[in-house]
Structures are given as structure tokens and as C-alpha cells.
Amino acid sequence: MIIFKDVISNDEMCSDAFEPKVVDNVVYEVDCTMIQVAEGDVDIGANPSAEDAEEGVDSDVQTVNNVVHSFRLQSTGFDKKSYLTYLKGYMKSIKNYLAENKPEEVENFEKGAQAYAKKIVANFKDFDFYTGESMDPDGMVALLNYREDGTTPYLIFWKHGIKEEKI
């Protein structure tokens, strides 16, 4: 399994069990599902065995987003102005990270991130925002939106702000 970690905060953001897809060579999109969990349950992306199916209804059951729940992502809020201020600082941090670690990616990141940021701004009202578990204000803010069907949630992670760790 590969864990996708934020290069700034080192928070776990996702894993390959959720089949991230690269979009525009600048972000990962991860389709999510709404699941029901009882207090204390953790979903790591594996399919439960049919033999382990639980019967009955528990009053402590909540409906949650599987990726948000599994990686303990924390909901946060932005207005457009504060998000753009955050994004400018975050992009600078990622550019510095790339300059030190992957200098060949800096140009691709700058072009792709600028174009994708315009898409975000154009559809700003459609997004919910999530930080990693540590809630590091300098770390990645993942974006949650819904597919055209209006019911399938998906998360967006900045590709260049992710490092892959095999476990």
C-alpha cells in the first residue's frame, strides 16, 4: 500500500487503496463514498469480508465520507479572499520544496497550478475544505466537490504537495 502524505505537514492525506487519478498533471482526484461507521471504526480502504457483516442498527452510527474519516481530515472554512491568500503562500512553499527536491518539476508545477487555481476560483462556492489531521495552517488544504451526478463526492489533492510512502 502507498500512503500519500503532505510534504509540508507530513499528514497522511490518502492512499492508493482509493485509486487516485492524476488530472491535468497537477492534482490527484479521489472518488469517495459516504459510509456508516460506529464509534471507534476506522476504514483503511480494504473491503470487509462478507462473513464479517454486522447485523442490526446502532444508535451511535454516523454517515461520513470514507476518505475524510479514514485519514482523519479536518474540515476548515475559507472565503474566497482568505483562500487565495492561503493558496499563494502554499504555492510558494511547494515551489521551494520542489526546487530543493525535484527541480525538474518546478516549471510543470507553476504552469499547471496556475491554470488549476483558476478553475478553483471559478467554482469556489462548490468546494468544501479539509486539512490534514494536524491542522497545520501551512499544510495542504484538500478540496471536496461532487461529480456531475450531484451525489458522488471527490477530493482534490495537489500532486506536487504529496509524497508517496510505501508501507
Swiss-Prot record:
Gene3D superfamilies to which the protein is assigned, alphabetical: Metal Binding Protein, Guanine Nucleotide Exchange Factor, Chain A
Q: Which GO terms describe its molecular function?
A: calcium ion binding
Q: Which PROSITE patterns match?
A: TCTP_1 (PS01002), TCTP_2 (PS01003), TCTP_3 (PS51797)
Taken from the record, one Pfam family name reads TCTP
Q: Which residues form the TCTP domain?
A: 1-167
Q: Which GO terms describe its cellular component?
A: cytoplasm; microtubule
Could you provide one GO biological process annotation from this protein's UniProt record? translation
Q: Which UniProt keywords apply?
A: Cytoplasm, Cytoskeleton, Microtubule, Protein biosynthesis
Q: Where in the cell is it found?
A: Cytoplasm, Cytoskeleton
- Primary location recorded for the protein, binned into one broad class: cytoplasm
Function description: Involved in protein synthesis. Involved in microtubule stabilization.
Q: What's this protein's family per the entry?
A: Belongs to the TCTP family.
Stated name of the protein = Translationally-controlled tumor protein homolog
Q: Which species is listed as the source? A: Yarrowia lipolytica (strain CLIB 122 / E 150) (Yeast)
Its lineage reads: Eukaryota, Fungi, Dikarya, Ascomycota, Saccharomycotina
